[in-house]
């Protein structure tokens, strides 16, 4: 229904609203704590509708920690294992978050990594302070060229650069295992935002659309100080990205 115009050439926003209403009649709720959806044992979440289920014992399981964390991050986070120091968040995406929104720190690992035994910033093998930055700065002289010999913006960066994934809680005491956290494909919050988008696009009940989006924002901030007066399509779509 949401992509009807793309598939059959005409929108079906009314159908979106009807299907969302049917789902909202079920036993699912918006969890009071956003982070419940990303905890180690998030199978307790009453918001998650369709998850990918994982166990630490899975041969090929949830390996987010391996993909994203620096080699020394486990020393700070309280577990062991060989990290790959790979995936970082795109800086522009990180900056779409309001730094006052708890989902900012709840989604990204940014800033100095402090050794819990000394209280000092950890050092990389190159002697740099282990400080995860938002931006990835290409080291001068390492820029790559394209097929025509022109310099590109691509090149080597320092191993500590880049915001790391912090959305799913890392279990303290993990020892060279996969993560237990399930990954939600759909949550009730997504249904709220889909219904809100459909209402805005069809020129429907903007009051209801605003209420739905604000329910997600209030849950995130813990108060109504950041509520929208009348939600726009851009604001709904941004809420979906931050969700």
What are these regions (language model features)?
Residues 238-243:
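Conserved small/polar residues in nucleotide/adenosyl-binding loops
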Residues 22-24, 211-222:
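Short edge-strand/loop segments of extracellular domains
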Residues 17-20, 210-213, 233:
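Extracytoplasmic/secreted envelope proteins and their assembly/folding machinery
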Residues 222, 231-232:
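Extracytoplasmic/secretory soluble proteins
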Residues 1-143:
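An aromatic- and glycine-enriched ligand-binding surface/loop that stacks and positions planar moieties
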Residues 28-36, 166, 170-172, 224-227:
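Glycine- and aromatic-rich loop/turn segments at beta-sheet edges
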Residues 110-216:
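C-terminal substrate/ligand-recognition segments
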């Amino acid at each position: 229904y949401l992509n009807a115009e793309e598939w059959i050439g005409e929108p079906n926003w009314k159908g979106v609203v009807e299907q969302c209403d049917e789902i909202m009649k079920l036993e699912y709720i918006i969890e009071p704590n956003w982070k419940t959806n990303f905890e180690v044992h998030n199978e307790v979440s009453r918001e998650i509708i369709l998850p990918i289920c994982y166990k630490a014992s899975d041969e090929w399981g949830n390996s987010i920690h391996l993909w994203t964390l620096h080699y020394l991050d486990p020393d700070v986070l309280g577990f062991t294992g060989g990290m790959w120091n790979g995936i970082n968040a795109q800086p522009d995406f990180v900056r779409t978050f309001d730094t006052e929104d708890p989902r900012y720190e709840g989604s990204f690992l940014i800033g100095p990594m402090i050794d819990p035994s000394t209280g000092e910033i950890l050092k990389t093998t190159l002697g740099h302070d282990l400080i995860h930055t938002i931006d990835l700065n290409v080291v001068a002289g390492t820029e790559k060229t394209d097929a025509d010999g022109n310099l590109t913006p691509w090149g080597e960066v320092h191993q500590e650069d880049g915001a790391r994934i912090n959305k799913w809680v890392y279990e303290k005491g993990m020892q060279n295992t996969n993560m237990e956290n399930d990954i939600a494909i759909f949550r009730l919050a997504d249904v709220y935002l889909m219904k809100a988008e459909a209402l805005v696009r069809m020129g429907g009940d903007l009051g209801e659309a605003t209420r739905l989006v604000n329910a997600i924002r209030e849950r995130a901030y813990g108060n109504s100080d950041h509520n929208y007066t009348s939600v726009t399509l851009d604001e709904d779509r941004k809420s979906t990205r931050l969700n």
